[in-house]
Amino acid sequence: MIEKLAEIRKKIDEIDNKILKLIAERNSLAKDVAEIKNQLGIPINDPEREKYIYDRIRKLCKEHNVDENIGIKIFQILIEHNKALQKQYLEETQNKNKK
């Protein structure tokens, strides 16, 4: 029984590692998005895109039997963090251009 518990926990640890790698990849892409938005003169906040994401997450939660509230909370955190990264990236870019 102890071995089974250890095996399950190891799988959970592996999943956690994959989740964090995917978050890092998402963060990196957020910087790319910021650069393109800056070139196009598009604001960081995009309520239409956020609505699309939340609608999509609700649908995916149903498909994968995940509590919708948890899915939405996770993506609220990710979206807010990515917007903060985009703002930081733009500020750094603007400061470099001033020098």
Curated annotation (Swiss-Prot):
Reaction(s) catalysed by this chain's protein: chorismate = prephenate
GO molecular function: chorismate mutase activity; identical protein binding
SUPFAM superfamilies: Chorismate mutase II
Enzyme Commission designation: 5.4.99.5
Pfam family, one: CM_2
Single biological process term from Gene Ontology: salicylic acid biosynthetic process
Noted pH dependence of activity: Activity is independent of pH in the range of pH 5-9.
InterPro entries (alphabetical): Chorismate_II_sf, Chorismate_mutase-related, Chorismate_mutase_arc, CM_dom_sf, CM_II_prokaryot
Pathway: Metabolic intermediate biosynthesis; prephenate biosynthesis; prephenate from chorismate: step 1/1
Keywords of this entry: Isomerase
Entry note: thermal dependence: Thermostable. The midpoint for its thermal unfolding transition (Tm) is 88 degrees Celsius.
Keyword Transmembrane helix attributed: no
Purpose: Catalyzes the conversion of chorismate into prephenate via a Claisen rearrangement.
Protein name: Chorismate mutase
Taxonomic source organism: Methanocaldococcus jannaschii (strain ATCC 43067 / DSM 2661 / JAL-1 / JCM 10045 / NBRC 100440)
